[in-house]
Swiss-Prot record:
Record's function text: Specifically methylates the guanine in position 1207 of 16S rRNA in the 30S particle.
Gene source species: Shewanella woodyi (strain ATCC 51908 / MS32)
UniProt-recorded name of the protein: Ribosomal RNA small subunit methyltransferase C
PANTHER family recorded: RIBOSOMAL RNA SMALL SUBUNIT METHYLTRANSFERASE C
Catalytic activity annotation: guanosine(1207) in 16S rRNA + S-adenosyl-L-methionine = N(2)-methylguanosine(1207) in 16S rRNA + S-adenosyl-L-homocysteine + H(+)
Subunit structure, interactors included: Monomer.
Pfam annotation, one family: MTS_N
Keywords: Cytoplasm, Methyltransferase, rRNA processing, S-adenosyl-L-methionine, Transferase
Length: 345
């Protein structure tokens, strides 16, 4: 099943006849594979690891799949580049720069997105190395714009797209590096502050789930540099931000993509997280429950599980099911800190 933006791209597949096409910020469907009915070759760059996994079993000589913040070959060029307009508007500028770097001279840019997602902003955001975007199609509550590369685009520099700032935490001052598209308040958010203020001393091998820009991992290493921390996230920009944060503070940790806990290996002494499950929707709540279950399976006997969650979210029954009891370490009018031991009676 194709998303609405993907259906609009497929409707305009004549744009890609016999072309070498790059798709940036792919959605979680099989549009890249279906594009091969008109295009000669398709390359994808997914920023969401789950979306990458959806396509991963369909790779072929003419369908090359990548996950990350950039392509491995910075000099590779394409006849056309498709951008799925991102939810974070600031990320659009980065993707446009990336598209310009990888387009051949006079190559075509296609930008697609939902009306309510801000895709109309592309007209104002387009860099001067592209011509004025043309609204080619409008269907399924989506818009599709085309533009042409009119002059050589600058090579992308991460330093142009990262925001570095000092952050005070209960463990001390840290330098945080945020790439565009990664959540940041430029201050310690209330939930993370409550979590870091009430943490027990952790044991050797620690998993930071949904690491984001690496605030929690860096704070832990500031207090306990002996920890062996693994940082996982589903978002490529977050993972690179985390790497930059660790480097800026002279810390070392293993940083990698994982869909849930599926890509983690072995068992952990502690799992810590400010998980990105805040809206209370059933689909999100189901993911949160899966996280509790997977955590219990990934902890060593006696291992600790420490998370902060919006106090209205229904964690308690699931925690009790898999950990045997519910231990609220601290709470305020917005958040609860759950701190549980596996096999704890």
């Amino acid at each position: 099943m194709l998303t609405n933006p993907s259906q609009l791209i497929l409707k305009n597949s004549d744009l890609f006849t016999s072309q070498n096409v790059l798709v940036l910020n792919c959605e979680g469907d099989l549009l890249p594979k279906q594009l091969l009915e008109s295009a000669s070759c398709v390359t994808t760059l997914s920023l969401d690891f789950h979306h990458h996994l959806v396509m991963s079993q369909h790779s072929s000589p003419n369908l090359t799949l990548h996950f990350g913040h950039q392509l491995p070959n910075a000099d590779q060029t394409f006849d056309s580049v498709i951008i799925y307009y991102p939810k974070a508007k600031a990320l659009a500028g980065y993707l446009l720069n990336l598209a310009g770097q990888h387009l051949k001279a006079e190559g075509e840019l296609i930008v697609v997105g939902e009306n309510k997602g801000g895709v109309k902003s592309i007209v104002k955001q387009i860099p001067d190395y592209f011509d004025t975007p043309f609204k080619r199609d409008n269907a399924r509550h989506c818009l599709l714009f085309t533009s042409q590369l009119t002059q050589k685009a600058p090579s992308i520099k991460l330093s142009d797209w990262v925001n570095s700032y000092q952050l005070d935490t209960p463990q001390g001052e840290l330098t945080i590096c945020n790439l565009v598209g990664v959540f940041s308040e430029k201050r310690l958010d209330e939930g993370t502050k409550l979590l870091l203020s009430h943490l027990p001393r952790l044991s050797r091998r620690v998993l930071d789930f949904g690491c984001g820009a690496g605030v929690i991992a860096a704070a832990l290493l500031k207090a306990q540099p002996e920890l062996e921390i693994e940082c996982v996230d589903i978002n490529a920009m977050a993972l690179k931000s985390c790497e930059l944060t660790l480097e800026a503070n002279n810390f070392t940790a293993k940083v990698y993509a994982s869909d849930g806990l599926s890509q983690t290996q072995g068992h952990f002494d502690d799992i810590i997280s400010n998980p990105p499950f805040h809206d209370g929707l059933k689909s999100t709540t189901d993911i949160a429950k899966s996280f509790v279950k997977e955590s219990a399976q990934k902890l060593k006997s006696g291992g600790g599980w420490h998370i902060v969650a919006n106090r209205h979210l229904p964690y308690s029954d699931t925690i009790n099911e898999f950990f045997g009891q519910v231990n609220v370490l601290a709470e305020n009018n917005k958040y609860k800190i759950y701190s549980n031991k596996i096999n704890q009676k």
